Amino acid sequence: AVLAAMIAKADVFIQNLAPGAMARAGFGSVALRAKHPRLITVDISGYGEEGDYATMKAYDLLVQAETGLAWVTGRAEGPGRVGVSCCDIACGMNAHAAVLEALIARFITGQGKGIAVSLFDGMADWMTVPLLQFEGTGRNPPRIGLAHPSICPYGAFGTRDGQLVLISIQNEREWTSFSAHFMDEPGLPQREGFRSNNERVANRAMVDAHIAAMFASLTRDACATKLRRANTAYGFVNDCEGLRTHPALRRIAVGTPQGPVEINAPAARLSDGPRALGPVPALGAHTRAVRAEFAG
């Protein structure tokens, strides 16, 4: 009764139970929209609500595997897992965007609509480029860790002080500058095996080894100085401590029942200043108020 009363006043109803579970409980999206025409319903699933996969369990890593993401991630020795729950996150982002679109449409038409989002569809969309590459060439994109399958040099190199620096050379002008100002070898682009990107890709092991020797002779800070002088795109391969102390990281304090904690700030920056985030409620903190509001 409480849920039905809440839905009657709601703009959006989102559920991610097993396909058909809400309908069996009397809260199927089609029936809800028939009863409440302005309601926007969102059904989140692993693989959609029809077909052989509809009843499959769909944890994030399983979907990484099923969509081919795990296959193109990692090193040559075998597939790898993306280190964050990207399928879950992508699904939520797709649902959020679709809800905003539906709210705008309802403002115009006065009608709600049904939205269905699956973890599989969200990650399959992200896999468009590898899939098109396979369909165009008949070959799966190779797994090469932090390198790039069609660009060289492009990858992470170890420094004298045990750090990793990632570089990306996008064109021959950048390669010429990198050779002169970082490698201190202005004639390197004229050497056999180093002359063009195609040559460098074909001789990747030789090129990478030659570049790695220079990185290994320098500290991370010295590498950064020379890379900036060469105007080469680079980044540090940070661990979590590196992220925690990163100068670009924005953090905010949020209240919890155990006291304030710092978390990473939401990505979007608003022109009228940072948004105010309320405290995280304790489990059941609002149960009595919600029941009182919708009980009768």
Spans of model-derived segments:
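Short Gly/Pro-enriched turn/cap motifs at secondary-structure boundaries
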Residues: 144-149, 155-156, 202, 258-261, ...
